[in-house]
């Protein structure tokens, strides 16, 4: 078993994307490779074909590796639902809510489960690409950190250290990280990868020499900043995303606003909208007049009742009511769907203190949060026009309709099993709708229907979505700037 670990000098340095590229590079070489991340902290999750919840990044990496995603690829998933707490998903199933103090007070049970999953993956595949978490040198948590060097040790994996030059301070990132690590951890780092370089790489040759001389570790590559692929991000809305942009929406484009909740989840639902020609997508946190926007989307949330109270405090409720009266389209996905209804009840304290919170009353539905989470990949058709739709469901709520509304989707399969069910509702004028389907905008016919609600002159672009080619494009880009011969020698050593 030959493994490779990809660690970072900090969060958001590009570990997930580099790991994704390596999964595809190794798969293209005919290697049976799979991704692994012992613990992920993210509200951006996905559902495996057998109905387990893992981080979205590991779903993407499994696709790049051409293997079926499983719960073992991300055995511990922390989904923040307050500023200091999170829901713990263990090997694909939600098991508890924990404060940060409680969780980190004793990580041994979580580590044992993670290493159990690691052993199963090692038995099932020839190679693992192991992604670390955050900075691999958080010394205040080092003795409790089982995601980075303890996992690398358990898998006997050499480590590539990824640093982000785009944010500045790359020398301090690398040399500082290496200098604080204990000798046995430093000895496991076999190479450095400088990520997101802009400009003429030849001008960084002195920088490479400086890094190698002062860290004692070879630089395996300098990867230029690259926008030529569309791959889901891991944790939160990417740092380069502008929230509350200045200026007004472009009158020459279809303009869509996504409300940026404090506990926003599954923001990758909207990546496909951003890539559409003639469409602009803005994330809005602070309440503002919605003039110039054709649609507003309420995304998923890991704390629906808390986020709807925040929405009211920010002044969004009256803005949305005005937008509705003026004929704007309002959509809700998962938690956003629940918010559009009349009420959200939490009798079991799933998201915190038990209670009931009034919704926005834009759809005649009511939601009750349950103790068991619904996890499935689903397919169906739009009610009325038969357009094919697909998505994945991750929710604690059960939502029922108590008034005059049209069904949105007829669900035909869940996790590959035939069903006869309905999901979502919309108003009779089709201006307000909600669904539990994450990823539904990835369904072309539904996406085109949505755009036609916003602009009668909309015509679909000729660009086709090809995720597999995106992975190949990413792999080619990284491989072109990485010393693969040296990397393979490190792995085989």
From Swiss-Prot:
Q: Name one GO biological process term.
A: cobalamin biosynthetic process
The stretch of residues making up the signal peptide is none
- What is the protein name for this chain? Cobyric acid synthase
- Alphabetical keyword list: Cobalamin biosynthesis, Glutamine amidotransferase
Example of a GO MF term: ABC-type vitamin B12 transporter activity
* Source organism superkingdom: Bacteria
Catalytic positions are: 334 (nucleophile), 438
PROSITE patterns for this protein: GATASE_COBBQ (PS51274)
Q: Which InterPro entries match?
A: Class_I_gatase-like, CobQ/CobB/MinD/ParA_Nub-bd_dom, CobQ_GATase1, CobQ_N, CobQ_synth, GATase_3, P-loop_NTPase
Please name the HAMAP family in this protein's record: CobQ
Q: Does the keyword Cytoplasm apply?
A: no
UniProt lists the family membership as follows:
Belongs to the CobB/CobQ family. CobQ subfamily.
Stored SUPFAM superfamilies: Class I glutamine amidotransferase-like, P-loop containing nucleoside triphosphate hydrolases
- Give every GATase cobBQ-type domain span: 253-446
Q: Which organism is it from?
A: Prosthecochloris aestuarii (strain DSM 271 / SK 413)
Q: Which gene encodes it?
A: cobQ
Q: What's this protein's function? A: Catalyzes amidations at positions B, D, E, and G on adenosylcobyrinic A,C-diamide. NH(2) groups are provided by glutamine, and one molecule of ATP is hydrogenolyzed for each amidation.
Pathway(s) where this gene product acts: Cofactor biosynthesis; adenosylcobalamin biosynthesis
